A protein has these predicted regions:
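Flavin-dependent oxidoreductase catalytic cores
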Residues: 1-172
């Protein structure tokens, strides 16, 4: 069999296949249908410093040629995530990439500091999601905001960090 391994930000993955954050929960929801051991990484749904209920329903609309969603980053919060989801993912032979979200720099830093000593492989900092009204989209569309949040997070993260940038700009 061919060697499919890749190096992502200094972390060796057995293959380049991961799931997009937000589409796969933290893996448990799909583990009966997808062998998580075959993935190079599981990128989790966004995790915030406290639980978020997300947007009111309906959150998904089918349209000609696809679908639109505005889930609003519903998540259990960092404490439950660390207690429940990380141990679940550790049973599999795959890398763990945690998507971090927040409404403010302080909220992002709360999550990053909490994850620093957890057995995860990388953090993906979500500064791209357009359905977060406070903070998230502002960081992702302003170069100074991106620079600030990235440099502050790097002060506390012990794992490699990747930034999930917004496509809602004229130039990246």
């Amino acid at each position: 069999m061919s060697n499919m391994s890749v190096n992502v930000a200094g972390v060796e993955w057995k293959n380049p296949v991961t799931v997009a954050s937000g589409t796969f929960g933290s893996g448990a929801e799909y583990s009966e249908f997808v062998d998580l051991n075959r993935l190079g990484a599981v990128t989790t749904k966004g995790v915030a410093n406290k639980p978020w209920e997300g947007n009111p329903t309906p959150r998904v609309a089918e349209v000609y040629g696809g679908m639109l969603n505005a889930v609003g980053l519903q998540n259990p919060g960092i404490e439950l995530f660390c207690k429940r989801d990380i141990p679940f993912l550790k049973q599999f032979d795959t890398r763990i990439v945690v998507n971090v979200c927040g409404h403010s720099l302080d909220e992002y830093l709360d999550v990053v500091k909490r994850l620093a000593d957890e057995p995860i492989d990388m953090m993906e900092i979500n500064i791209s999601c357009p359905n977060v009204k406070e903070g998230g989209i502002a960081f992702g569309t302003d170069p100074k905001g991106v620079e600030t949040i990235t440099s502050e997070i790097k002060k506390y993260a012990k794992q490699p960090v990747i930034m999930k940038l917004s496509p809602n700009v004229t130039s990246i």
